[in-house]
Amino acid sequence: MHRIAVPAAKGAPTAQAPVKVAARNLDFYYDKYHALKGINIEIPEKRVTALIGPSGCGKSTLLRIFNRIYALYPKLEARGEVLLDGENILSPKYPMNRLRSKVGMVFQKPVPFPMTIFENVAYGIRHHEKLSKADMQNRVEHALRQGALWDEVKDKLGQSALGLSGGQQQRLCIARAVALRPDVLLLDEPTSALDPISTSRIEQLVEELKRDYTIVIVTHNMQQAARVSDYTAFMYLGDLIEHDRTETIFSQPSKQQTEDYITGRFG
């Protein structure tokens, strides 16, 4: 039986990490379509949690609920609770600007803004904070360093971000997301449009970033989930089937559906 090789534990302490994000009895509807069904999940702080499952299972939908990006579109409704540090972000009283600063997101395809590299990173900061020129320069440099991009762009910050390679653009998007110093970083298949070398660099970056951020990553690549995550959640047809430590999910899953998926029997 084919199984995914899971790397040795990546230095995470054995003690239970504090819960950063928790979904409680979460349902989601696309108009009348019931896309997520009673999801209950706890996302540990400063760990990487991977969401896996076949296309259409609800993993990207769940990710988008964590920052309420669905609220930009009509006829979409979430019911239940999503707690960030114990506060329900689905409450109408929870400020959207606050949520956007606390939960960053990087999408499947790099989406640099049509402006300079510097302004791409500074853009979000300007909307949330008033910094001096020197402080802004320091913040942009720090974000680009966290995005593992500084050494490649430090001499061309005034050039268009559209001239960067695909892998560089995605790291720029990560730098732009962390520039606001969020608590949580959401990654929606961040390497699916990249070559193997760029993919490897992003995976290394994820490992580095979890020292400072709680990370949730959606991936169709089970080998990637095994490499980068501390915890893995398997979803199927809008249900959360199983959620456990990654080494457990890939070596001793408790549910037959999980076993069938990771061994390639369906998906």
UniProtKB/Swiss-Prot annotation:
<comment type="function">
    <text>Part of the ABC transporter complex PstSACB involved in phosphate import. Responsible for energy coupling to the transport system.</text>
</comment>
<keyword id="KW-0813">Transport</keyword>
<dbReference type="GO" id="GO:0016887">
    <property type="term" value="F:ATP hydrolysis activity"/>
</dbReference>
<dbReference type="InterPro" id="IPR027417">
    <property type="entry name" value="P-loop_NTPase"/>
</dbReference>
<dbReference type="Pfam" id="PF00005">
    <property type="entry name" value="ABC_tran"/>
</dbReference>
<comment type="subunit">
    <text>The complex is composed of two ATP-binding proteins (PstB), two transmembrane proteins (PstC and PstA) and a solute-binding protein (PstS).</text>
</comment>
<dbReference type="GO" id="GO:0005886">
    <property type="term" value="C:plasma membrane"/>
</dbReference>
<comment type="similarity">
    <text>Belongs to the ABC transporter superfamily. Phosphate importer (TC 3.A.1.7) family.</text>
</comment>
<dbReference type="InterPro" id="IPR003439">
    <property type="entry name" value="ABC_transporter-like_ATP-bd"/>
</dbReference>
<feature type="binding site">
    <location>
        <begin position="53"/>
        <end position="60"/>
    </location>
    <ligand>
        <name>ATP</name>
    </ligand>
</feature>
<keyword id="KW-0472">Membrane</keyword>
<keyword id="KW-0067">ATP-binding</keyword>
<dbReference type="GO" id="GO:0035435">
    <property type="term" value="P:phosphate ion transmembrane transport"/>
</dbReference>
<protein>
    <recommendedName>
        <fullName>Phosphate import ATP-binding protein PstB</fullName>
        <ecNumber>7.3.2.1</ecNumber>
    </recommendedName>
</protein>
<dbReference type="GO" id="GO:0015415">
    <property type="term" value="F:ATPase-coupled phosphate ion transmembrane transporter activity"/>
</dbReference>
<dbReference type="InterPro" id="IPR005670">
    <property type="entry name" value="PstB-like"/>
</dbReference>
<dbReference type="InterPro" id="IPR017871">
    <property type="entry name" value="ABC_transporter-like_CS"/>
</dbReference>
<keyword id="KW-0592">Phosphate transport</keyword>
<keyword id="KW-0547">Nucleotide-binding</keyword>
<keyword id="KW-0997">Cell inner membrane</keyword>
<feature type="domain" description="ABC transporter">
    <location>
        <begin position="21"/>
        <end position="262"/>
    </location>
</feature>
<keyword id="KW-1003">Cell membrane</keyword>
<dbReference type="GO" id="GO:0005524">
    <property type="term" value="F:ATP binding"/>
</dbReference>
<dbReference type="InterPro" id="IPR003593">
    <property type="entry name" value="AAA+_ATPase"/>
</dbReference>
<keyword id="KW-1278">Translocase</keyword>
